[in-house]
Structures are given as structure tokens and as C-alpha cells.
Amino acid sequence: MKFTKFLLLGAIGIAMPLLAGCGSSDDIQKEGRLSIVYYPGGYGQDYLDYFCKNFLAKEKNVSPDDIKPGVDYKLIADPDITYGASRYITSKSRCPDLIISNLLSTKAIPQGLIAPLDDVYDTQVNTSKGKKTIREFAMTEAVQQYTVELAYGQTGKYSFAMPWTAIPLSIAYNNTILQKIPHVSSIAVGSDAISNGKWVRAPKTVTELKAIFEDAEAYDNRLTKFGWAAVNGANWLETLIITWWAQKQGVDTPHLYPSEGSYYDFWTYSSEEIFKQTGLQDALAQVKDLLIKDEQFVNSFPTVGNMTIKMAQQSFAEGKALFCLTGDFFEKEYKSVIEQSGQEFKMMRVPAISGAVTKEDGETPLDLSYLNISSCAYVPAYAVNKKLAKDFLVYTSSEDNCLKMSEMTGAIRPFSYDARNNSGYSQMSSFTKSVYDLFYESDDYLVKYPRNVSPENISPIYLYENVSENVFYGCNYLTIMSSLKNLTPKQIMVDGKGDFKSVYDRAVEAFRDWRRRYGL
């Protein structure tokens, strides 16, 4: 595993609207009581209760049983915190000590609303390789992404957040069903994919994926081959698009198209010409080949045009689809449904596209994983217990506590440790183990961040214009997928057609404004 290649998903330029309401109570601030607002999805609250009790017990030299929720600490679950943090961080009277959220806007930094965490990063914690500062123990590039200029054009920088979890985004599959499917397609597959005439492993290439689609149709034509959603969920196709794009374009260095730059060169946002990368068109072409035929969605749920990603993942958990786009949280979110179905689910790597960049042998496709590491923890400037919150961040960043969080939640923390070493690993589900294997057995990672440039040279367009939230500037994923029904990838990305303005033409207009705004 290449920890030096471990980066954060750069969705940090997003604006935070002021929303009405709060968490569970107005009683947030209290001197001496640690208050944490957190996003409740995925991992629950038990691990936070555990950390708060054990941390505060150590601070107060008492037993964890003596630490009481509501008295010594307060946890506030807020499902709107991702886009609603401003109602906390702008309030001097209702500001928590710590926020754990999926996103943090860099626009809050020059406003002085986020406390610096350099002292936290420079504190030593225990690891299996001796004491290390958190800055050393965390992924270098993760630290860099959460270090920005105080404001564009100013001198001086500080680290403003701690990375919290690393979420591999990929394809889950129903292993119970997969191993019942006979291989009858004429498409050749790897010899290790089939045993006694039936599938025994997930497809490793797009060719094998197409083969099992045909086999699944012959086995049970009521079974949906690929679970995704067009309504509030088409963006999940980014998992496929980014992986196939990087495989054709090259990860750090150009692969098939030397004059166009690599995948990571795209995120430098050097000019509108980045949207002409052919690898991105190749990825769209592959999506179209798998999911669209005769201007209709195929290999998908019959009602995909009306489905949300939650509906798609629920149907997948019920055993109605063979594959589905999801993340490491899938099993926990749909635990009761999975238990009722009695079926086994696993996570697989996105199958390699033809012509993908290879390992040193020149034949085997590079094992790439697309990661979401935008989840972070930060201390608002108006917090009344800043030191307590910072000490809590230090406490949770030791290797033992990274392992403890993995044991309790199955989550992977973005630090230099192996979650498979946690004490509960042997009792973990095959799904969680497959997520760990996907993550730790990767040759490289894909995130939406310009890792080919130093932090001080990152474009202000990337930092402040929210460009990392969507690869296709000016078009959402539903528009892209709907347009793919009757347009070519090149028409979508570069040429346009009729009333459809290409992504490139939209970017030309945007770059004109950005150059004026930032003096580029």
C-alpha cells in the first residue's frame, strides 16, 4: 500500500448556507463540558460515547463509568450539518466545541471562523512504530489539503481540520447470487472466475463484467444487473467514471494521451483545456456501453429514472440486483434488510477498462481505488472549550484508538495503520473484510485533488469555486446521463450539439470570469 499516494477528496470549496434549527437542544455551550455536533449517518454514536467517556475519564482521573452524557459531554446528531454548519460556527452563544462533518468550506477560513489546529498536528501520539506527531502519522497529503492560506493573496497558512474517515467508494455485489450463476456467455473470462461451470469471484475487467451481465440475464431475467439511481444518485456513477478515466488518462503521468496530461493534472485547473482530456470521454463511452441501449437505460432497475440512491441500495440489499454502487457504510445502513435476506454481500474493485494503465509487468491493470476522505473534524473559533476539543482530537488519533474505531464501526481512518489489525477483525463480516482488502491492497488511490502541485501552488479556482464537487462543470450527473442517450461523449465534453452546450464551452465562460476575479 502506498501511503505516500494517499489523498483527500477535495470537496472543500462548498458554501455553507444558513439554515434554521439546531441539533437536539439549544443547550450546546457550557464551559468544562465537551460538546460535539456530528453527522449521524454510517457509523452511529456508540464509538463517540466510548471515546468521550474514556478521554474524559483520563482527563479527570476517574473511571469511564463516572463520566455521564449530558453532564460531562454532549453529543448532538445533526443530519443537516454537512451543508448547515454556518448556523453553529457563526454563533457566539450556540457554538459546539467540535464538529464532525462530511464537508468544510475553505470560505470559512478567511472569516476567522475555524480555529487553527497546528498545535494538534504537532503533538505526538503512540503508534506501532514509536511516537510520531499527528502530522507524521496522518497522510502527508491529507495534512496539506487541510492547510490553506488565511485568504487568497495573503501570506500565512494554518491547518484547520483533521481528516476523520477514509471511505472506499466502489461496487458491492451479492455473492450469494453470483455463485449460483452459470457461465453461458460466449465472452471469455479468466480461468479462476469459473468453477464447476459457475462464477466464483467478482469480475476483474469490464469484459468480465459484460460476460456476467449476459450470464445473469440467462439465469434470471428479473434480476437487475447493476444498481444505480438517476434521481439524487446519478453522481454515484462518478465512481466508475473517475476510475476508468484515470486508467486511460494515466494517474500521475499521462498514459494513452501524452499531450493532454494525467488525471491528477486535471485538478490543477490550469485552463479550460483540461476538459478536453480524451480519457474522460473514454470513461463516458464505457458507461454508455454498459447502461444505455437504443436511447434507454439498460442493465438497470426498471424504475431507475425515478429512483434515489437510497432506493437503489435498499433494493440491492433485498437481493433484487447483482451489483450496486455504494461505500463501506452499506452493510451498517441496511443491516436489518440484509439480515432478513440472509445473503452475503462483498465489495469489489471497479473492473479495469481495456487499455488501462498497468503495473510494472506491463500486463496487469493497476489496482486503483476511488476514495472519499472529505469527512473531517474541526474546532470552531467561538467554541468555549477549545483546548478540551483539541486534546480529544489528539486522543482519538493514536494508533490504538484508530484501531478501536475500526473495531467498533468498521471504518478506516486516514492514518498510517492497518485496520485489519484491530482486535475484532476475525469476527467482522465478509463485507467489511472485503472493504479492507480493497483499500489496503490498492496500488494507488484516486481523489479529486491536485496532488501534482504543492499546496501553495494550488489554483484559487480549485480552492474557492467548488469545482471538485462535480467533474462536469455546469452539468449535473443526471444531465450527463440523460444526454448520453442521444449524444456522444465528445459532443458532451467538447463539441456540443444543437441546444446542448458542451462542458468545455461552459468552462470557457467560467474561466473568463475566474481569470478576472483572481488576476490569473
Q: Residue locations for each model-derived region?
A:
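Conserved N-terminal structural module of periplasmic/extracytoplasmic solute-binding proteins
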Residues: 5-9, 16-113, 125-132, 185, ...
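Short helix-initiation/N-cap motifs at beta->coil->alpha
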Residues: 74-84, 204-208, 301-317
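Hinge/lid segment of periplasmic solute-binding proteins
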Residues: 102-170, 185, 346-350, 358-362
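Short, solvent-exposed loop/beta-turn-alpha elements that line the ligand-binding surface or hinge
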Residues: 119-138, 185-201, 248-282, 354-368
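Extracytoplasmic/periplasmic solute-binding protein
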Residues: 147-165, 169-171, 205-272
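Extracytoplasmic/periplasmic substrate-recognition and gating elements
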Residues: 155, 338-420
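Glycine-centered hinge/linker elements that transmit conformational signals in sensory
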Residues: 210-213, 254-306, 350
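Conserved C-terminal helix/tail region of periplasmic/extracytoplasmic solute-binding proteins
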Residues: 419, 423, 433-520
